[in-house]
Amino acid sequence: MQTEGKKNILVTGGAGFIGSAVVRHIIQNTRDSVVNLDKLTYAGNLESLTDIADNPRYAFEQVDICDRAELDRVFAQYRPDAVMHLAAESHVDRAIGSAGEFIRTNIVGTFDLLEAARAYWQQMPSEKREAFRFHHISTDEVYGDLHGTDDLFTETTPYAPSSPYSASKAAADHLVRAWQRTYRLPSIVSNCSNNYGPRQFPEKLIPLMILNALSGKPLPVYGDGAQIRDWLFVEDHARALYQVVTEGVVGETYNIGGHNEKTNLEVVKTICALLEELAPEKPAGVARYEDLITFVQDRPGHDARYAVDAAKIRRDLGWLPLETFESGLRKTVQWYLDNKTRRQNA
């Protein structure tokens, strides 16, 4: 399925929120081919890929990254030039109650994928072996908490994960770097800030608030809502990830952020203001969307602030986000308003 001179990229977790954006970007904006490997858990949705599903440069394999035999089959069958590893359990709240799933997928699954990639890479012709890339996509949560400082996370910030989720991703990051250092597997790591955009599973803050507001349900905000996050539009992130896997330097780490620091309460209030404009006909009994905001008990171990310094990827690879938080959030709200069936399924 590979076009002459173009890459064949294996994307794990390609039916997820960020993964599907990456797959769409590659198929719609490059001449590369994609093999989408996804287990299709609750958060995976092939509807996100209907626009490109019939493209001859796209293939889908329903495979668990913990299934080594199936991984070996996929590598042998499709012979990828690069791996973009996004398959992961990613919701912090779920990790608090079901940490074992996160250990299995995020740590053991990454190990199995690394070993399958290494076995495949070692038997490649020398010129192909040198060009091969293993790009591991991670989170800024591995760095811990910036509470009480004006600092930003850089690529050299020490790891200090606070939750079972971030600890599992930190472990995966360390495995990838160890395989690069020990076995010379050509690897790159990127760490991103909070993603948002159309098609996101509604357990995450922004889609949950949009969908609850449109249904007249409470808008639950942890604690006092003062926690700060940096927000990155998912399509900007997809462009960055493609640049990293095609242009990034082996052994390097790239932080990817939107320079959009907002408190959680600011985000929810901005969503409410957009809905007042774009969906003025409210559910019965709702005078203002903001009236639905409800403060709830804070999450255990809730980090106060994340903020990413994306200067390195801007300087070295020339990447810049195209969306402001305001423009990206408007597109996101409008998508949920325009996709009522998706809202009902969510």
UniProtKB/Swiss-Prot annotation:
* Obligatory cofactor(s): NAD(+)
- What is the cofactor note? Binds 1 NAD(+) per subunit.
State the source organism's domain of life: Bacteria
Instruction: Check the record and name the CDD domains matching this protein.
Output: dTDP_GD_SDR_e
**Which InterPro entries does this chain map to?**
dTDP_Gluc_deHydtase, NAD(P)-bd_dom, NAD(P)-bd_dom_sf
Protein species of origin: Neisseria gonorrhoeae
Q: Which UniProt keywords apply?
A: Lipopolysaccharide biosynthesis, Lyase, NAD
Query: Where is the catalytic site?
Result: 140-141, 165
Q: What is this protein called?
A: dTDP-glucose 4,6-dehydratase
EC? 4.2.1.46
- Binding of substrate, residues: 90, 139, 194, 204-205, 220-222, 229, 264, 298-302
Gene encoding this polypeptide?
rfbB
Q: What pathway does the UniProt record associate with this protein?
A: Carbohydrate biosynthesis; dTDP-L-rhamnose biosynthesis; Bacterial outer membrane biogenesis; LPS O-antigen biosynthesis
Q: What does this protein do?
A: Catalyzes the dehydration of dTDP-D-glucose to form dTDP-6-deoxy-D-xylo-4-hexulose via a three-step process involving oxidation, dehydration and reduction.
